[in-house]
Amino acid sequence: MASFSTNEFRSGMKIMLDNEPCVIIENEFVKPGKGQAFSRVKIRKLLSGKVLEKTFKSGESVEAADVVEVELDYLYNDGEFYHFMDNVSFEQIAADVKAVGDNAKWLVENNTCTLTLWNGNPIIVTPPNFVELEVTETDPGLKGDTQGTGGKPATLITGAVVRVPLFIQIGEVIKADTRSGEYVSRVK
């Protein structure tokens, strides 16, 4: 199994800690005036999502996580699992609700998503950065209603709620950013 020295730590690197895959968020190399140098690392556990800080002595080795990211197309949800398919091999992978998490509201059939696999099992499902969804419910925009430029809430076809400008009507398709949950533009 591959391993990394603390001198090789970079943001986004995936390592094993307590038999759980983790991703490095921040890495700070500290060389005090007296004593041995060390790395102060901020880590997010991929299974639980917990963020913690850990210090490693300079030159210490850490096992690399056997984590693979693959691009798969979202097919459907059967109530218990979300099903994805590889366009090349047509192999299907089922992800549970825990792996999908809050991203379920951004999953659109046939959109390409990034799945993080550990030991062949999906642990994180990341939707595309932008999705196009239809507005199913929103207040009508009244003429002259310009007090407060915050817009109005709109419910999308997947159940996600996004703040949209006043001119957006029911039935229109909008482009939303899945990372921030914000309205980007109207799709023509």
From Swiss-Prot:
Lineage summary: Bacteria, Pseudomonadati, Pseudomonadota, Gammaproteobacteria, Vibrionales
Swiss-Prot/TrEMBL GO biological process terms: peptide biosynthetic process
Cell location: Cytoplasm
Domain of life: Bacteria
Transmembrane segments: none
Family to which the UniProt record says this protein belongs: Belongs to the elongation factor P family.
Protein name: Elongation factor P
GO cellular component: cytoplasm
HAMAP family recorded: EF_P (MF_00141)
SUPFAM superfamilies: Nucleic acid-binding proteins (SSF50249), Translation proteins SH3-like domain (SSF50104)
SMART domains the record matches: EFP, Elong-fact-P_C
Known role: Involved in peptide bond synthesis. Alleviates ribosome stalling that occurs when 3 or more consecutive Pro residues or the sequence PPG is present in a protein, possibly by augmenting the peptidyl transferase activity of the ribosome. Modification of Lys-34 is required for alleviation.
NCBIfam families to which the protein is assigned, alphabetical: efp, PRK00529.1
N6-(3,6-diaminohexanoyl)-5-hydroxylysine PTM positions: 34
Molecular function, one GO term: translation elongation factor activity
Alphabetic keyword roster: Cytoplasm, Elongation factor, Hydroxylation, Protein biosynthesis
Modification after translation: May be beta-lysylated on the epsilon-amino group of Lys-34 by the combined action of EpmA and EpmB, and then hydroxylated on the C5 position of the same residue by EpmC (if this protein is present). Lysylation is critical for the stimulatory effect of EF-P on peptide-bond formation. The lysylation moiety may extend toward the peptidyltransferase center and stabilize the terminal 3-CCA end of the tRNA. Hydroxylation of the C5 position on Lys-34 may allow additional potential stabilizing hydrogen-bond interactions with the P-tRNA.
